[in-house]
Amino acid sequence: MEGADLLTAGVLFLFAAVAAVPLAARLGIGAVLGYLLAGIAIGPWGLGFISDVDEILHFSELGVVFLMFIIGLELNPSRLWQLRRSIFGVGAAQVLLSAAVLAGLLMLADFLWQAAVVGGIGLAMSSTAMALQLMREKGMNRSESGQLGFSVLLFQDLAVIPALALVPLLAGSADEHFDWFKVAMKVLAFAVMLIGGRYLLRPVFRFIAASGVREVFTAATLLLVLSAALFMDALGLSMALGTFIAGVLLAESEYRHELENAIDPFKGLLLGLFFISVGMSLNLGVLYTHLLWVAASVVILVVIKMLTLYLLARVYGIRSSERMQFASVLSQGGEFAFVLFSTASSQRLFQGDQMALLLVTVTLSMMTTPLLMKGIDKWLSRRLNGPEENDEKPWVEDDKPQVIVVGFGRFGQVIARLLMANKMRITVLERDIGAVNLMRKYGYKVYYGDATQVELLRSAGAEAAESIVITCNEPEDTMKLVALCQQHFPHLHILARARGRVEAHELLQAGVTQFSRETFSSALELGRKTLVSLGMHPHQAQRAQLHFRRLDMRMLRELIPEHSDMVQISRAREARRELEEIFQREMQQERRQLDGWDEFE
């Protein structure tokens, strides 16, 4: 693709995303489906603005690559070892069972048995990009079903290697094309990558971080991710698997959070590009000529995978309320099918339109998942939140609460308990089904749902409430909810949880002045107790704590425009000197006056 064409394609992608995704979000069908529809609109079977779909689809896989790197950063080798049962137990069972059933059905549809085996394996895989995005949106990341879903996806990525090796064997060309020496060299190169990464990555990043130039650190992070992806691609393996391993190797390093911050903006844009490319690849010509076949295939694929996943979740011990979410989020075909089916086509395993039919089935199955998840969310909301005797009542029965608490993790629980102990009327919204079920057993009024949906907030009593307390785990959800409340419920007094200084700056920029940094207050309190244990008078230690809090908040406000700049470092040094001067100035006065306590802002 020429430079000018690439620029034109980039503009079209951005325009399609900006136009389609907000519209999809407004319709309540989710960003992923919006990207897919945008791809159909600008692709060769839509308005025809872009025709070179294969090249763009290959490039857009970088979105999945960046996503897997960030996921790897959130794990570590010991955590992976803990997940071994779910990865190699449930993951392997899902692939083998689904592939066997689907291959049998393809044979009944006049596929050669070799093509049916490849088709069954490809259809058994799920979309890593879509499933992880939806799990994040639905708050499944930290739930048991979310962890199991991740394990299944990880096994599917690992299964790429033997699946690709199987294609030439099934094509009957093992003697001509299948070289065991090349396979051994690939395994050796893979081992070298593991060992080299284990011992070289941290020293390299330590050297780069010592330069103090943020842009160089970002460039080094991009270099690592892209190099790992290209290396694995050259070996004929999954690019996403390579970057996932690189992330795991750095998961225990001191640079984990900085790496994640450097990659995150690129991940979001490239994931959007990936979904647009998938939409562009939808062959509407095959869909029109084989409409009934494709429609039946999509339904059968989704139903078989959901049944398999639901049964495995039941055997594994997942709560009944979480099984449907787990089964539906992995029910689609995946991006790996495009790679596997292309390889099989080059080996002439498929006949006629068979490959095109399978790819259309995979693409359409990906489009069903957001709608399926939305329907299951509504069903779960009514089942979990609706009163048993009268289903006609709204899902959230507290129509006039004083306070709405969003999120019922450890942070939110403390706040809710304090409010309830003081006879305040509260409504708690939580999107982790397991947490909802558990807390209801203890008598808490907790309701299931995604608080970033305006209708749920309205039914929860946001129009009558005085305050909303936001305790979401994800900073993106917090900021989205803040914007939502400011737009639709401007009367609400917003109080929020900030995980650190960066999020605190974002809240201040958004106009939220009442927030609590979760580790800051507890750290200050422990610091005060430490001063007392070292012999400082309790009153003097309390004043030191209050001065520190006041100065830190002032510095936080002053540094809003430069919260990601090196200015913070010099300002922090000035603040430390200023704090020392305050303490020295007041030391003598505090020794004479040890009664009474200061109020602070």
UniProtKB/Swiss-Prot annotation:
GO biological process: proton transmembrane transport
Compartments reported by the entry: Cell inner membrane
Source superkingdom: Bacteria
Membrane topology field: Multi-pass membrane protein
InterPro entries recorded: Cation/H_exchanger_TM, K/H_exchanger, K_H_efflux_KefB, K_uptake_TrkA, Na+/solute_symporter_sf, NAD(P)-bd_dom_sf, RCK_N
Location (main, coarse): membrane
Residue span, RCK N-terminal domain: 400-519
Xref: Pfam families: Na_H_Exchanger (PF00999), TrkA_N (PF02254)
Keywords per UniProt: Antiport, Cell inner membrane, Cell membrane, Ion transport, Membrane, Potassium, Potassium transport, Transmembrane, Transmembrane helix, Transport
Keyword Transmembrane: yes
Cellular component terms per the entry's GO annotation: plasma membrane
GO molecular-function term, one example from the UniProt record: glutathione-regulated potassium exporter activity
Membrane-spanning intervals of the chain: 4-24, 29-49, 55-75, 87-107, 111-131, 152-172, 177-197, 207-227, 230-250, 262-282, 284-304, 324-344, 356-376
Quaternary structure note: Interacts with the regulatory subunit KefG.
Record function comment: Pore-forming subunit of a potassium efflux system that confers protection against electrophiles. Catalyzes K(+)/H(+) antiport.
Family per similarity comment: Belongs to the monovalent cation:proton antiporter 2 (CPA2) transporter (TC 2.A.37) family. KefB subfamily.
Name assigned to this protein: Glutathione-regulated potassium-efflux system protein KefB
Species of origin: Salmonella newport (strain SL254)
Species classification: Bacteria, Pseudomonadati, Pseudomonadota, Gammaproteobacteria, Enterobacterales
